[in-house]
């Protein structure tokens, strides 16, 4: 009897010791989290939204396994601001990032990477950064200059253990170089793109935007070929790290942001189309293959079931490109639907069976509160004015409407307020307000402002309250 009591005491002791050592539960039980955001991909540029030209089989398949988010919005109609919203849950104007190549991620902001790192996650960022300069020693990209630290803000300042990224855009093939001359007869140019230069033995020079993987550490080796493959090579190295820790990765490929460059392999997939379409569609298919490669790795290594993956674009398609906004009005840089509504899906096989379309408004500012809620870490949501909300109950099928409206603004003075049904918009500075019923008129063709002035007035009051809140944040009043 004494021996049995001793054994039971030892079992109880070691059980209690385990609980004391890991009061919040094993970090290995936490899901991996991946946020993929591509660049300038229009709502209509993917098969999952009905495009029959562009080949995106991997994106289509992943969307079919999860939730297709058919009313998903970027927080802004351009690049940098949307990126800021993804990792803070806040409108980018609150932190002084009103447009591309303006402002930078502030140290006072609390990012999703910082929060999950404290929860035991390994954190990595890959691809485009666009939230600050990455060097103070050499000329780089749009704003990096020797001796200039005014916008120096690298991922490791904001919770990332590892990173491999550029300040801004690069060509979508052979990202570090550009040809000395372009085939202008085919419409090639430095701005819009070209066929892979080295395939034709063209003379080349540095493009002028570099990849960085540490403080003043440029990556110059193994930088040839498909840009998204180069990025994914680094992602997979990161994922091969400590197997006992969950990972959080933001993967932001540059495709199909200009200049679009495609190799012969991908151009030939679209031989029946124009040269511009071959470059544009080819770059998207190349990117799609690499996202498929990522998921295949996760399945092969047994990580896929417990990985939460989100996919979206940072804004609508660029003007004067083959990009498609689908049935929606206007494109990038506009607060009409075509500038903000983007292709998106989410899957987490272990938790959600998926296979559904969710026709509920969501946007990139929802990422932070939603992910922390799904991790059962709502208490870690920053006590700052957030513009996003947790959409966990929508994903779980408990509610089918958005409870918190979404505010939008752009540096040209445009502003907008969107709820479950209606959209109020002033499309540029001092322009009169327009009102659309997005449930019956998603293409924004019938302005209802004169028919429903009371709805417009109520939404205008809420929009103006929100704009005052954003202005207060921009003045630094959110920070101690």
Language model features: what each stretch is:
Residues 2, 16-433, 438-480:
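Formylglycine-dependent sulfatase
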Residues 5-13:
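Bacterial N-terminal signal peptides
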């Amino acid at each position: 009897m004494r021996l049995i009591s001793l054994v039971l005491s030892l079992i109880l002791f070691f059980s209690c010791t385990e609980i004391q050592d890991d009061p919040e539960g094993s970090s290995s039980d936490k899901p991996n989290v991946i946020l993929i955001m591509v660049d300038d991909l229009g709502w209509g540029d993917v098969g999952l939204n009905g495009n029959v030209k562009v080949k995106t089989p991997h994106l289509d398949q992943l969307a079919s396994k999860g939730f297709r988010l058919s009313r998903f919005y970027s927080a802004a109609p351009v690049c940098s601001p949307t990126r800021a919203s993804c990792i803070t849950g806040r409108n980018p104007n609150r932190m002084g990032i009103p447009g591309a190549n303006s402002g930078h991620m502030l140290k006072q902001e609390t990012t999703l990477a910082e929060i999950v790192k404290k929860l035991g996650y390994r954190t990595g960022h890959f691809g485009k950064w666009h939230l600050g300069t990455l060097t103070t020693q050499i000329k780089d990209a749009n704003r990096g200059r020797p001796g200039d630290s005014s916008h120096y803000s690298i991922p490791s300042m904001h919770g990332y253990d590892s990173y491999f990224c550029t300040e801004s855009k690069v060509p979508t093939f052979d990202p570090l170089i550009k040809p000395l001359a372009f085939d202008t007869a085919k419409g090639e140019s430095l701005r819009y793109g070209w066929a892979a230069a080295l395939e034709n033995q063209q003379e080349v020079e540095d493009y002028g935007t570099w990849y960085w993987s540490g403080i003043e550490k440029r990556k110059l080796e193994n930088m040839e070929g498909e840009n998204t493959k180069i990025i994914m090579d680094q992602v997979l190295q990161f994922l091969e790290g400590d197997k006992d820790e969950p990972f959080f990765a933001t993967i932001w490929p540059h495709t199909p942001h200009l200049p679009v460059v495609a190799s012969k392999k991908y151009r030939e997939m679209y031989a029946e189309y124009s040269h511009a379409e071959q470059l544009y569609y080819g770059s998207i298919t190349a990117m799609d293959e690499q996202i498929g490669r990522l998921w295949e790795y996760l399945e092969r290594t047994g990580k896929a079931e417990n990985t939460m993956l989100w996919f979206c674009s940072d804004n609508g398609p660029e003007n004067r490109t083959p990009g498609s906004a689908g049935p929606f009005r206007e494109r990038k840089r506009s607060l009409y639907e075509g500038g903000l509504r983007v292709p998106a899906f989410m899957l987490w096989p272990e938790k959600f069976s998926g296979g559904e379309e969710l026709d509920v408004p969501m946007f990139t500012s929802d990422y932070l509160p939603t992910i922390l809620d799904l991790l059962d870490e709502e208490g870690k949501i920053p006590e700052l004015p957030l513009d996003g909300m947790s959409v966990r109950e929508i994903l779980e099928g408990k509610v089918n409407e958005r409870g918190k409206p979404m505010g939008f603004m752009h540096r040209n003075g445009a502003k907008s307020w969107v709820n479950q049904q209606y959209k109020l918009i002033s499309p540029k500075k001092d322009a009169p307000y327009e009102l659309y019923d997005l449930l019956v008129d998603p293409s924004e063709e019938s302005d209802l402002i004169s028919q429903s002035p009371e709805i417009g007035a109520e939404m205008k009051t809420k929009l103006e309250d929100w704009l005052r809140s954003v202005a207060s944040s921009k003045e630094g009043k959110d920070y101690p």
